[in-house]
Amino acid sequence: MKLPDLRNFDLKEKRVLVRCDFDVPLSESDRKVADDTRIQTSLPTIQFLLNQNAKVILLAHLGRPEGQVNEEFSLKPVFEKLQELLPRTKINFQINELSNCELKTEDNEITLLENLRFNKGEEENSLEFAQKLASLGDFYINEAFAVSHREHASIVTLPRLLPHAAGFNFQKEITVLSSAFENPKRPVVVILGGVKEDKLKVIPGFLTWVDRILIGGYLPVLINKQPNLAIKDPKIEMGTLAENKLDLDLGTIERFSSVIQKAGTIIWAGPMGKIEDEEGQNSTRIIGQVIGSLNALRIAGGGDTEAALTKFNLLANMDYISTGGTAMLEFLANGDLPGLAALRE
């Protein structure tokens, strides 16, 4: 899939708006960034722009402040982490409302705007809000793949108001994930877990091209409670919880492992049990180990999945870790995303 390449544009001394994914976990004790992986993925694009003497304006959100200013969701910890990661670069933190916003970013400087979701216009996909953002820049870059399934102002409307391109990590996501469904090594096995009901919405799309779908985590319980969520298809294998209700039972682990061992491509999103509890860790660990033993294309995505892989030292078992969970699944299931479509226009 061809997207506008930022290297093909003259961005020297231009004001460049970069939509980043800075929705990072914060430590409860001191409200500092606990894991800077998402910030790190934006750095190659940011550094490229700085090398062009561009004025870099970063747009991002943190959490769900519901359109209200809430210090709990301030991007100040992200600002502090950026200063730590880019010690030689002047970085400004703009906390004013956009209506009062007069950016004084100089060439080769960065300005981080406060949480976009403090304004209702972001999640409402307001044209007026997007126009205010557009007035701050000459060019737009999407480096927030993980949010690109959202029809929000900074994702789908803003790129329609400015010349635009995909960031380096965004382009990498599309290239790697496209290879999984354009010419897949079969059988293709999708593993869905965790607790988010949203994952069930991608099943119809996957059924058009994958060979098996294994459903674990808390999702089987959700389906049992809401029969309208159930999709009957011979490609789908439903997990069963153990008596402790914290993990899959041994029979399910054996069934899932048997299917996975035959896979040519594996797509994994969501832990199989409640990994925060010691009694809920067995299935995720075993299935991760089985995946690691295979000569298959192994793709995982989502914060909870990455946390599980990290916890059990299984990150090296995967060929690619996507920054997106739901975005990855929606792209693989349906071949497109709202933010991706906006970049192609």
What are these regions (language model features)?
Residues 1-345:
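Active-site loop-to-helix "anion-binding N-cap" substructures in soluble metabolic enzymes
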